[in-house]
UniProtKB/Swiss-Prot annotation:
Chief location category: mitochondrion
CDD domains xrefs: HPPD_C_like, HPPD_N_like
Keywords for this protein: Dioxygenase, Iron, Metal-binding, Mitochondrion, Oxidoreductase, Repeat
InterPro entries: 4OHPhenylPyrv_dOase (IPR005956), 4OHPhenylPyrv_dOase_C (IPR041735), 4OHPhenylPyrv_dOase_N (IPR041736), Glyas_Bleomycin-R_OHBP_Dase (IPR029068), VOC (IPR037523)
Gene it is expressed from: Hpdl
Similarity section: Belongs to the 4HPPD family.
Name assigned to this protein: 4-hydroxyphenylpyruvate dioxygenase-like protein
GO MF term list: 4-hydroxymandelate synthase activity; 4-hydroxyphenylpyruvate dioxygenase activity; metal ion binding
Length: 371
């Protein structure tokens, strides 16, 4: 591996000036402003909840935004993942030797609190770039060049990033998996026993309706780096687009489709977000009518009626449960969304929940089209 990622520092978005993403992250999802930078036509606002940090880059300018680049993408998008590495200069040399393109070479930024060094690497995943950051010893609240903002305690709904899901073109997962392995040290994480890394986990969603292929990647076991999930469509017999194909069309190619945010209490978090105006996906009614679903929910210590009212999905076995709720898209283009996830011993993603998400997205698309 050329530059093993040690932890996720932040996820960056690029949106037009005035787009409400930063406001919504605060008002609906409980993120709190951490630091800001305004220069050269850019307004860069870092927001935090627990260890999860989002950097919202608004506007455009003659120079690149600090710690990233301007993707010149036609729609709002999650455009950058920033990872901490041990030595940026060494990582850049190793990546260059592998043929990687670095639109921003190793750059040092200094302020009164210390120094950080970063480089930006183009990835094969659409408009997604990767920032490799070295900031050991930096004493500021975020990064050099940013002005710290007064810290106000938030509701604590989100503790950290659980996983990152990339929407990929059909057949591209093996190539992407090798790239992330060779360049950042990610390894295949089986989602089912005996899973072939080249094939991933196939989740069929219905007769003739295709499905999804999921390939999960992680760095070292017990690492704080979130799991990376590659999602691509499986061909079906109908012309109906699934959520991955819809993302590729509306986003203009592959990219970061959603971020799974870990919550220690999905009941409180989903209820609070809904009261704040959050738009959560409604699971299909049949999901809660499945044989054994009520008993499964009761065994987890929850009330079926409440989970259904909040749109919370539950999957699991014995004493290990997975609870998930998904937002509608944060952008008008109906692309990127967020997921809240609470794990009660479960480590996977729940095939039944994946099918329910697929159907929820299809039903939401049908409602939007008035069909």
């Amino acid at each position: 591996m050329a530059a093993p990622a040690r932890r996720l520092c932040h996820i960056a978005f690029h949106v037009p000036a005035g787009q409400p993403l930063a406001r919504d992250l605060q008002r609906i999802f409980g993120f709190q402003p951490l630091a800001v930078r305004e220069a050269g036509g850019w307004r860069q606002l870092a927001l935090r909840s627990g260890d999860a940090v989002f950097l919202v880059n608004e506007g455009t300018g003659p120079r690149e935004p600090l710690y990233g680049l301007d993707p010149h993408h036609s729609v709002p998008s999650a455009t950058n993942l920033c990872f901490d590495v041990e030595d940026v200069d060494r990582a850049a040399r190793a990546l260059a030797a592998r043929g990687c393109i670095m639109p921003v070479p190793p750059t040092r930024v200094r302020d009164a609190q210390g120094t950080a060094t970063y480089t930006v690497v183009s990835s094969p995943a659409g408009n997604l770039s990767l920032t490799l950051l070295q900031r050991a010893g930096y004493r500021g609240s975020f990064l050099p060049g940013f002005r710290p903002l007064p810290c106000t305690p938030g509701p604590g709904w989100v503790s950290h990033v659980d996983h990152l899901t990339l929407a990929c073109t059909s057949g591209s997962s093996p190539t992407l998996m090798r790239w992330f392995h060779n360049c950042l040290g990610f390894h295949h994480l089986p989602l089912s026993p005996g899973e072939d890394p080249e094939l991933g986990l196939k989740v069929a969603v219905g007769s003739g309706r295709g499905g999804l292929r999921l390939t999960a990647l992680q760095t070292l076991p017990n690492s704080t780096v979130p799991t990376l999930v590659l999602a691509e469509s499986l061909p079906g017999l109908t012309s109906e687009q699934d959520q991955v194909e819809q993302f590729l069309t509306r986003h203009g190619g592959p990219g970061l489709q959603h971020v799974g945010l870990y919550t220690p209490n999905i009941i409180d978090a989903s209820e609070g977000m809904a009261k704040a105006g959050g738009r959560l996906l409604t699971p299909p009614e049949a999901y809660y009518q499945q044989p054994g679903k009520e008993e499964q929910i009761l065994a987890s210590g929850h009330k079926p009626s409440f989970l259904e009212r909040q749109g919370i999905l539950l999957d699991g076995d014995k004493d290990e449960f997975l609870l998930q709720v998904f937002t509608k898209s944060l952008f008008d283009e109906d692309t990127f969304f967020l997921e809240l996830i609470e794990r009660q011993g479960a480590t996977g993603f729940g095939q039944n929940n994946i099918r329910a998400l697929w159907q929820s997205v299809q039903e939401e698309a049908a409602r939007a089209q008035g069909t």
